[in-house]
A protein has these predicted regions:
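The alpha-helix within a helix-turn-helix
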Residues: 143
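Extracytoplasmic catalytic/substrate-binding loops of multi-pass membrane glycan-assembly enzymes
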Residues: 7-14, 191-194
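Membrane-water interface segments at the C-terminal ends of transmembrane alpha-helices
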Residues: 1-5, 18-133, 161-177, 186-188, ...
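Glycine/proline-centered hinge or cleavage motifs at structural transition points of membrane proteins
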Residues: 146-147, 160
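Short cytosolic juxtamembrane segments of multi-pass membrane proteins
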Residues: 233-245
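Short glycine/proline-centered loop/turn elements that form peptide/ligand docking sites
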Residues: 135-139, 238
Length: 245
């Protein structure tokens, strides 16, 4: 409308933020993002950390080839990854619904979560691998000599030292999932509509300042996460005995 596109506005107002919090469509998509992103992040952190630790071992063959395959989702254009995921998860979804009798809505969430986890794993692998570069492997051997099993060694020796890298990778994975729109449009349905998807629909179907209000909220979330990353980086440097410049 003419009033909607009029600048300068009549006055400062928070009504578009109120529209975001009071509108059912915006809130449904927001909560979908809050459900999907954390679960995808947990999967990414778990698998990515294990992969990084495994690839850090000297006896693993073809480490470069394996690493290239694992980080390929970050390198390959997203539209290509989304197309491949569409065919793969379509077959998987049909199997889960027809053979296992699972609910269609639940299967949709599973597909989106797994797809976002795949996109987040490369970030976790890279950050944890970078942290492991300065890790003294003699600590794990000493723990084994003292009778600690591999699980105890990981949680009591390795994890405290690589924790900043794990959290950094998790934050990158969370941001990737929370801001992703292409893959979820390929493999998701209306029930799994996320916040970026809702913003994309809003840009196509209407011109509303509510979209700008939502974008501002997302920017604030991203800035907060980046500040957390910087604090973790400084903590990691202190643990390694490096003085920040």
């Amino acid at each position: 409308t003419t009033e909607m596109l009029q600048f300068d506005p009549a006055g400062y107002s928070l009504k578009h933020y109120q529209d975001f919090f009071n509108n059912d469509e915006w809130q449904r998509s927001f909560w979908n993002s809050l459900i999907i992103a954390p679960i995808a992040t947990i999967i990414s952190v778990t698998l990515g950390t294990l992969a990084a630790i495994g690839l850090s071992q000297s006896h693993v063959p073809a480490k470069r080839a394996i690493m290239a395959i694992l980080i390929s989702p970050m390198i390959v254009p997203l539209i290509i990854s989304a197309t491949g995921m569409f065919f793969f998860y379509s077959s998987m979804g049909n199997f889960m619904e027809d053979t296992l009798g699972m609910d269609k809505n639940f299967v949709g969430y599973v597909k989106v979560v797994l797809a976002h986890a795949v996109l987040g794993i490369p970030f976790v692998i890279i950050t944890v691998t970078a942290t492991l570069v300065g890790f003294d492997s003699s600590l794990t051997r000493a723990a084994a000599n003292m009778g600690a099993n591999p699980v105890t060694t990981f949680f009591r020796v390795q994890m405290p030292l690589i924790f900043p890298g794990v959290v950094s990778g998790g934050l990158f994975a969370f941001i990737t999932s929370f801001d992703e729109v292409v893959v979820v449009m390929f493999i998701g349905s209306a029930s799994q509509k996320t916040l970026p998807w809702q913003m994309f629909i809003g840009l196509r179907e209407q011109i509303s300042p509510t979209i700008l209000a939502v974008a501002t909220i997302l920017v604030c979330i991203s800035v907060a996460l980046l500040m957390t990353l910087e604090l973790l980086r400084r903590r990691s440097e202190r643990l390694r005995g490096i003085t920040p410049g």
